[in-house]
């Protein structure tokens, strides 16, 4: 007669301990992996504002600069053409375009231009504009005094708005031989959707955006 193999109590306890240790190791490994992934995601989010700050501070990658006033030296005789480009990222139902596609200005001349934005949705939507200039070597010389890109924009259903940009090209660009022969600068904006917009009350008289601009 054949006999089925039997397992002693000690062997059974040892087997259960082995299974328990295996499960414990799996849980530990899963926890470590989850922690590493969370750390990497957090680091990637932290890198975005740092990268934006670095670009604004240095003009890297064609990022323009922020100025508080007109240049002390005033405009110079050299002229340059400035083209205006507009884009809207997927997921934001806006129509966005410059009122002028190109203008000619003196270097150092403070100039105001307008972009027109229309919310084509039947709901309130919000967006934030990213920007750069081309060629990339001009980023540190393109100075903005006022720009809709500085803040998040919230639009009511069907709302149409004119958004100003006040800028100048720093006269010191004339001393940069890397930009000798430069005749045209392209200023480009892309509006991206904001999922959780900050609700701000509309100030009295804010409707006329052309008042009070340089």
Curated annotation (Swiss-Prot):
Protein name: Cytochrome c oxidase assembly protein CtaG
Cross-referenced SUPFAM superfamilies: Ctag/Cox11
Record bears the keyword Transmembrane helix: yes
Primary residence: membrane
Alphabetical keyword list: Cell inner membrane, Cell membrane, Copper, Membrane, Signal-anchor, Transmembrane, Transmembrane helix
Spans within the Periplasmic topological domain: 52-214
Family designation: Belongs to the COX11/CtaG family.
BP term (GO), one: respiratory chain complex IV assembly
TM annotation in the entry: 27-51
Cytoplasmic side: 1-26
Role: Exerts its effect at some terminal stage of cytochrome c oxidase synthesis, probably by being involved in the insertion of the copper B into subunit I.
Protein's cellular compartments: Cell inner membrane
Pfam families documented for this protein: CtaG_Cox11 (PF04442)
Membrane topology: Single-pass type II membrane protein
Annotated gene: ctaG
InterPro entries: CtaG/Cox11_dom_sf (IPR023471), Cyt_c_oxidase_assmbl_CtaG (IPR007533)
GO CC terms of this entry: plasma membrane
GO MF assignments: copper ion binding
Keyword Transmembrane helix: yes
